[in-house]
């Protein structure tokens, strides 16, 4: 959830500015403080850090006045110790010769800290990170090289960590170590980089290497070295040619990660959905991995669909289509609850793991635990080379481009169209659909980008108007049946995430079993009416009878018997195809959430207490 970056330039004194630009590209991960460390000539390690927003800290601490070619930077999301200036990264050793930034959680930090303090080290922060600098200091003091110190560190630390480190003894290098926390190396012209995320290095590098668990090494202006541990406790460099084989070219431009004139990333990404859908759909239907994945799903003894947050909701939608089209009764699993299902996992189990970043901690823990019991894994991710990509037997890639806003929008619909396509293919593999029917349904999905485009245009004004009326609301229901109930869950999450209005989603048929007790005059209820469940109008009517303000969001060609007093927002027609309902209906709720946040004075890109990529437990 923190973000780290390290840069080594061949010439100039602009590393501080470049670090700040890279950290700004990591803001989407969530943070409460930031800092940098730079080696200034002729040989001085300088740290500037504080709690607060990047721009504020840069101004307050004089970050841009630092001069040097090599440095590291960090945005912190507090896990050990409150957000304050002392706990902000980077952290240094007793002598001020080693600086470290870290993403992850060190599980055995308490015992390590006690041991270090007993040996005379003075640790000033409450973080689990600071002890890394002191351990390195000890190893160097015993005569080990920095690489040997990193190797020892990897054997001592328990938990997850991506580390970038500076050492005054080698002022042209940034060292790194990675275990269970994402880290990439960027290769540029006259500059090399290491960072939590490809997005952070786009200004300086387009060729990247995704590091694997246990790997460590260094970057300098002239080159990169990567080492891996051996079973005997030693380590070795990657074999000749292996480094070059792992280099991947990134086609994203820096501009694609900017706001492109929109006031917020969230709004930009809502409007990017037609393109993201087109590229994801075109990519998946041409990907040979689709049929491999479909064969696994069709032949599964049991199927688990696992994800967290929005990715879990996409999994619910995928589960709906797998059941309806392929007759496959899978189990949707909230990733943090995966241990409940572990006793039933064996070699007959197939797992569909959904994670936009491919680095979601709970999802990866489920995948690793279940793979250890023989399960085969299909990964669904937006990031090539991510941890999920590497863990999966088969990976199906979103092609949505970078998503910066913390609240997922375009990746939800991209995940949806990918899982719909997988469901159709699995139905074909299972013999539930003929080849002609498979082609016909796949052809229906070709209309998804246009349905989303028209839905966005149809929703903008209505969502803005509704937000102005609802900005003072304290709570609302968003309900639906069948597919609509699943879309309602994602709609409610968006409203909660960015506007801080409590929104509860549940299957509409459950109203009389408890939730309707909260309905009183003026209480807001949204009803998601999908092509499979026009009977949901009965639930809308019973809410209206209790005085609720009811708005039904439905495709314009869905036949509904609507009594007076219930508002119906007519979205683009779907021709009765439930396959197109998500693209006709979801954008309204995304825009409603966005405009509610803005109307209430909140930044929808940076909701409080949340992070884009949750890489810790």
Curated annotation (Swiss-Prot):
Primary subcellular site in the record, as a coarse category: cytoplasm
Catalytic site positions: 2, 612
Keywords annotated in UniProt: Aminotransferase, Cytoplasm, Glutamine amidotransferase, Repeat, Transferase
Subcellular location(s) per record: Cytoplasm
EC number(s) from the headed UniProt entry: 2.6.1.16
Aminoacyl-tRNA synthetase listed as a keyword: no
InterPro entries: GATase_2_dom (IPR017932), GFAT (IPR005855), GFAT_N (IPR047084), GlmS/AgaS_SIS (IPR035466), GlmS/FrlB_SIS (IPR035490), Ntn_hydrolases_N (IPR029055), SIS_dom (IPR001347), SIS_dom_sf (IPR046348)
One Gene Ontology cellular component: cytoplasm
GO biological process: carbohydrate metabolic process; fructose 6-phosphate metabolic process; protein N-linked glycosylation; UDP-N-acetylglucosamine metabolic process
Reaction(s) this enzyme catalyzes, per UniProt: D-fructose 6-phosphate + L-glutamine = D-glucosamine 6-phosphate + L-glutamate
Pfam families: GATase_6 (PF13522), SIS (PF01380)
GO molecular-function terms, A-Z: carbohydrate derivative binding; glutamine-fructose-6-phosphate transaminase (isomerizing) activity
Enzyme class: transferase
Domain Glutamine amidotransferase type-2: residue ranges: 2-222
Domain SIS as annotated: residue spans: 293-432, 466-607
NCBIfam families to which the protein is assigned, alphabetical: glmS, PRK00331.1
Quaternary data: Homodimer.
Task performed by this protein: Catalyzes the first step in hexosamine metabolism, converting fructose-6P into glucosamine-6P using glutamine as a nitrogen source.
Protein name, as recorded: Glutamine--fructose-6-phosphate aminotransferase [isomerizing]
Organism: Aeropyrum pernix (strain ATCC 700893 / DSM 11879 / JCM 9820 / NBRC 100138 / K1)
Source lineage: Archaea, Thermoproteota, Thermoprotei, Desulfurococcales, Desulfurococcaceae
């Amino acid at each position: 959830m923190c973000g780290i970056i390290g840069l080594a330039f061949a010439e100039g004194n602009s590393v501080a500015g470049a670090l700040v630009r890279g950290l700004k590209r990591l803001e989407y991960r969530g943070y409460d403080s930031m800092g940098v460390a730079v080696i200034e000539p002729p040989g001085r390690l300088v740290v500037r850090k504080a709690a607060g927003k990047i721009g504020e800290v840069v101004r307050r601490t004089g970050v841009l006045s630092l001069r040097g070619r090599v440095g590291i930077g960090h945005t912190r999301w507090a896990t050990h110790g409150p957000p304050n200036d002392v706990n902000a990264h980077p952290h240094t050793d007793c002598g001020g010769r080693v600086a470290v930034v870290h993403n992850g959680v060190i599980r055995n930090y308490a015992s390590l800290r006690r041991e270090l303090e007993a040996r005379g080290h003075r640790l000033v922060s409450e973080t689990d990170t600071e002890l890394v600098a002191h351990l390195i200091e000890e190893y160097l003091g015993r005569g080990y090289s920095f690489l040997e110190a990193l190797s020892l560190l990897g054997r001592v630390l328990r938990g997850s960590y991506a580390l970038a480190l500076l050492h005054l003894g080698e002022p042209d290098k940034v060292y790194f170590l990675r275990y269970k926390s994402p880290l990439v190396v960027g290769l540029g012209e006259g500059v090399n980089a290491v960072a939590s995320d490809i997005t952070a290095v786009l200004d300086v590098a387009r060729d990247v290497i995704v590091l694997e668990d246990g790997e460590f090494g260094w970057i300098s202006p002239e080159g990169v070295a990567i080492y891996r541990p051996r079973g005997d406790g030693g380590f070795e460099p990657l074999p000749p040619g292996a480094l070059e084989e792992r280099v991947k070219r990134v086609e994203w431009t820096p501009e694609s990660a900017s706001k492109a004139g929109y006031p917020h990333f969230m709004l930009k990404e809502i409007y990017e959905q037609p393109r993201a859908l087109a590229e994801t759909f075109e990519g998946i239907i041409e990907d040979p991995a689709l049929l491999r994945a479909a064969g696994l799903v069709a032949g599964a003894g049991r199927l688990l669909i696992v994800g967290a947050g929005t990715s879990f909701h996409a999994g619910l939608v995928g589960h709906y289509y797998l059941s309806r089209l392929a007759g496959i009764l899978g189990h949707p699993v909230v990733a943090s609850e995966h241990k409940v299902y572990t006793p039933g996992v064996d070699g007959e189990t197939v797992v569909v793991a959904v994670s936009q970043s491919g680095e979601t901690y709970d999802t990866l823990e489920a995948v690793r635990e279940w793979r250890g019991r023989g399960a085969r894994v299909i990964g669904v991710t937006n990031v090539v080379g991510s941890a999920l990509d590497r863990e999966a037997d088969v990976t199906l890639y979103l092609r949505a481009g970078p998503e910066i806003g913390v609240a997922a929008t375009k990746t939800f619909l991209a995940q949806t169209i990918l899982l719909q396509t997988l469901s159709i293919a699995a139905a074909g593999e299972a013999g539930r659909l003929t080849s002609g029917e498979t082609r016909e349904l796949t052809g229906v999905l070709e209309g998804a980008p246009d349905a989303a485009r028209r839905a966005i245009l149809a929703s903008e004004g209505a969502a803005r108007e509704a937000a102005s009326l609802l900005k003072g609301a304290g709570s609302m229901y968003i309900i639906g049946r069948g597919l609509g109930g699943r879309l309602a869950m994602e709609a409610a999450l968006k409203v909660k995430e960015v506007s801080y209005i409590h929104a509860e989603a549940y299957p509409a048929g459950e109203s009389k079993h408890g939730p309707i007790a909260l309905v009183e005059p003026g209480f807001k209820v949204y009803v998601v009416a999908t092509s499979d469940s026009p009977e949901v109008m009965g639930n809308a009517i019973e809410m209206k009878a209790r005085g609720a303000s009811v708005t039904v969001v439905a495709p314009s060609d869905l036949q509904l018997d609507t009594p007076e007093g219930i508002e119906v927002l007519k979205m683009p027609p779907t021709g009765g195809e439930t396959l197109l309902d998500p693209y006709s209906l979801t954008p309204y709720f995304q825009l409603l959430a966005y405009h509610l946040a803005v109307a209430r004075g909140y930044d929808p890109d940076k909701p409080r207490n949340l992070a884009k990529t949750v890489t810790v437990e």
